[in-house]
Curated annotation (Swiss-Prot):
Residues 75-92 have a biased composition (Gly residues). Residues 29-147 are annotated as: Disordered. Residues 34-45, 60-73 have a biased composition (Polar residues). This is Uncharacterized protein F53A9.9. The lineage of its organism: Eukaryota, Metazoa, Ecdysozoa, Nematoda, Chromadorea. It comes from the Eukaryota. Residues 122-147 have a biased composition (Basic residues). It comes from Caenorhabditis elegans.
Length: 147
């Protein structure tokens, strides 16, 4: 069963209005369901519109949709034929099965990013001040001077 913002899978049924239904399914008004055609919709000036749909089997992904066969996913979609899930609540994977309920999808990394531990520079900051620290910072590691 597909949700309103994701992909229904390889041969899945039609899904909600903002996603793609999968390899052989029909799609909603903002998606593409073509196997080989990933062309975007265009506005009155011919400018591509790829905000809420899928790029198709081999097409590029959209910002809020699902990617093509081997393409990376957008931030709110699943990945497609063989790619990992986006790890969000707005999509599912496609041809490959989704993870069990409660398990993050592939590509979802819990926690934050590593932050450089700068506590050993405290004395350096106090002695030289911020402006001088900026000048010397690149040379500080690897050798230490008596102050």
């Amino acid at each position: 069963m597909a949700n309103n913002y994701g992909n229904a899978g390889y041969n899945g049924p039609t899904n909600g209005p903002y996603g793609n239904a999968g390899y052989n399914g029909a799609n909603g008004p903002y998606g593409n369901n073509s196997v080989h055609q990933g062309q975007p919709h265009t506005d009155q000036n011919g400018v591509p519109i790829l905000h809420y749909g899928n790029g198709g089997y081999n097409g590029p992904q959209a910002q809020y949709g699902n990617a093509g066969q081997n393409q990376p996913s957008g931030p709110f979609g699943g990945a497609g034929y063989t790619g990992p899930t986006a790890g969000t609540g707005f999509g599912n994977a496609g041809y490959t099965p989704s993870p069990p309920a409660g398990v993050p999808g592939n590509g979802f990394v819990p926690g934050g990013v590593d932050v450089h531990d700068d506590h050993h520079h405290d004395g350096h900051h106090k002695k030289h001040g911020r402006k001088e620290h900026d000048h010397h910072h690149g040379h500080h590691h690897g050798h230490h001077h008596k102050h």
